């Protein structure tokens, strides 16, 4: 990781790439490594088939940090990344196995931001890091699950997506603890209990619907079947 790595959305024109450079304050392109993502990357990292390169607009700048710094995400164009919060990006990146990086996200036009993680993965691989594709796909699932729940509760003044992000962290930590203590993944009943307890702890159990709770339970079951559950690094990044 000699230089920051910038990954542009494949749908950007040359002018838009220059505008994105300006958003990242890149004055001299010799100081960064630049690449871009396309529909093949969506398939390779996220398992999304039939993606459209021209729809990939959001871009990322990724810089490696010292060990122990954790994953820090800054959304530079908050008005244009309409669906995903910086905490949701960070949590999902940690699930995928990303550690100790600073990620800046920017988009020249309004986008959901759901594909930005693809750029993060591409940046890591460009710097010689290997990713577990089961984990990158579950991380995408996580992003979509939290985003869907937030969307479903957009008109609910009692809902707070920050508390949902905290509940997600709690769920991951508890599942890891169960596996460590009993030597095997949580049973279906234990998973339900972990999700119920986390939602109660962060005052969400009476706020989100049973349908949303079921989505979280489904995600938790998938999550504990990846190597993220055994990773000490994940637990350290989550703290």
Q: What are the residue ranges of the model-derived segments?
A:
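Soluble oligomerization/assembly scaffold segments of membrane-associated complexes
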Residues: 88, 94-207, 211, 218
């Amino acid at each position: 990781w000699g230089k920051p790595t910038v990954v542009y959305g494949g749908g950007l024109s040359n002018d838009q790439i220059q505008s994105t450079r300006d958003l990242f304050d890149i004055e001299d392109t010799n100081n960064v490594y630049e690449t871009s993502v396309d529909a093949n990357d969506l398939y390779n990292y996220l398992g999304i088939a039939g993606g459209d390169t021209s729809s990939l607009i959001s871009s990322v700048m990724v810089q490696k940090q010292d060990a122990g710094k954790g994953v820090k995400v800054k959304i530079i164009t908050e008005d244009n990344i309409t669906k995903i919060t910086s905490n949701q990006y960070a949590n999902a990146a940690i699930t995928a196995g990303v550690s100790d990086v600073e990620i800046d996200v920017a988009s020249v036009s309004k986008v959901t931001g759901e594909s930005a993680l693809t750029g993060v993965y591409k940046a890591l691989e460009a710097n010689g890091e290997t990713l577990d594709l089961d984990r990158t796909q579950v991380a995408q699932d996580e992003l979509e699950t939290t985003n869907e729940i937030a969307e479903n509760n957009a008109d609910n003044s009692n809902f707070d997506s920050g508390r949902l992000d905290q509940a997600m962290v709690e769920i991951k930590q508890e599942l890891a603890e169960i596996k460590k203590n009993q030597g095997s993944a949580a049973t279906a009943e234990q998973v339900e209990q972990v999700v119920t307890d986390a939602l109660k702890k962060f005052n969400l159990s009476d706020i989100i619907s049973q349908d949303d709770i079921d989505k979280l339970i489904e995600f938790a079951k998938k999550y504990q079947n990846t190597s993220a559950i055994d990773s000490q690094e994940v637990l350290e990044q989550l703290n």
